[in-house]
Regions:
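Short, glycine-/small- and polar/acidic-enriched structural segments
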Residues: 1-97, 112-120, 131-139
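Short acidic active-site motifs
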Residues: 4-5, 102-104
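Pocket-lining segment of extracytoplasmic ligand-binding domains
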Residues: 22-23, 103-176
Length: 176
């Protein structure tokens, strides 16, 4: 659980952690700039899954209900950005937030017309439970459509390290 990792990083009980990208900035503030991002460990991995073949772009989500996790987390920020880049806001669709990806997968299994935003491997699990479900939008591809000039990547996970550990044990961190 990312919140447990965050608490351990803030308290100094944990030296290095792999965390969602948005959590790195929170840790940076909570530790008074006491952590650094040392690498990007996850790019992309976010998908919109549905049985509805008519969903072929972000704009096709208009007027629909989308199930997803984590209000105020990386998937939410990505969605909000993509909506804005496509001339939309969250008011153009209904977003139902669930507390974890397994809950979104359960909705997709129970409601055959549901649409969900899930990371891997949860989208694959959901598809295994509902044979009509497919990945209709790859959010990495949607992100890249908004970034043709600068090649920005959709970063979803990073590794953070306490600065004192980085300074005092540089060889160990390099080995990590």
């Amino acid at each position: 659980d990312a919140s447990e990792l965050a608490a351990q990083m803030v308290s100094g009980d944990l030296d290095i952690a792999l965390v969602p990208a948005n959590l790195a900035s929170i840790l940076y503030q909570k530790t008074k700039q006491g952590v650094e991002v040392i690498d990007i460990n996850t790019l992309g991995v976010l998908y919109v899954a549905a049985a509805d073949d008519s969903i072929q772009s972000i704009a096709d989500l208009k007027g629909k209900t989308l199930y997803m996790t984590g209000k105020g987390t990386t998937p939410d920020y990505v969605l909000q950005y993509l909506l804005s880049a496509n001339g939309m806001t969250s008011d153009d669709l209904t977003i139902e937030y669930k507390s974890e990806a397994a809950e979104v997968a359960a909705v997709l299994k129970e409601q055959t017309d549901a649409i969900g935003l899930l990371p891997q491997p949860f989208v694959t699990v959901a598809m295994a439970q509902n044979e009509n479900l497919k990945m209709v939008l790859n959010l990495t591809e949607e992100w890249e459509k908004t970034q043709p000039e600068n090649g920005s990547a959709l970063v979803t996970g990073v590794t953070v390290c306490r600065k004192d550990v980085l300074e005092d044990q540089a060889d160990a961190v390099d080995t990590f």
